Amino acid sequence: MGQSTHQPDRQESQSRVPELDFYGRLGMATLLLEQSPYHKQWPLYDAELELVPPLHLNQCKFYFDQQQNPVAFVTWSSITEATKDKLVNQGGQMQWDDWNSGDLLLFNDFVAPFGHTPEIVKDLRNSDWPCDIAFSLRRAEDGSVKKVNYWWHKKDYKQNDLAQRRQGLKISV
């Protein structure tokens, strides 16, 4: 499986990032999770449902510093409206079959323990996604959903454009 990578410094060549197999990517993700105050509370067994599917399906992107050290990663899924409703209203985790089940883009995990958030958000907004709007869930420590965040594609969208696009969406919470 290929590895999706990004380098904050565009002058660095992506070919310098070593190709990693599934276990190498799992190790990088685990290292970053352990550095994140929010994510390090996860029990290790959550990795089976939260990390293994996106790593196998190549629905993740790693970010590296100039020395090729991993500094962040993002996972996403394409889910159904029913899966979204279940996640928002009941909490819990997706099952394997949920990860590629529909056309709603969910950024499942955004792990950036060393900063780099503005660069990553800019990269995600300028990436080629199959839809204009994605969402992510802000969770409380107990796993319940505190907020549904909506993301719009490309930096030229304005906040009122997003509000107009939302009117046609079913929004829970």
Positions of predicted regions on the chain:
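Acyl-donor binding region in acyl/amide transferases
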Residues: 80-158
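Alpha-helical oligomerization segments
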Residues: 153-171
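Short alpha-helical segments and helix-capping/turn motifs at coil-helix boundaries
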Residues: 46-48, 120
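Conserved beta-strand in the GNAT
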Residues: 62, 66-78
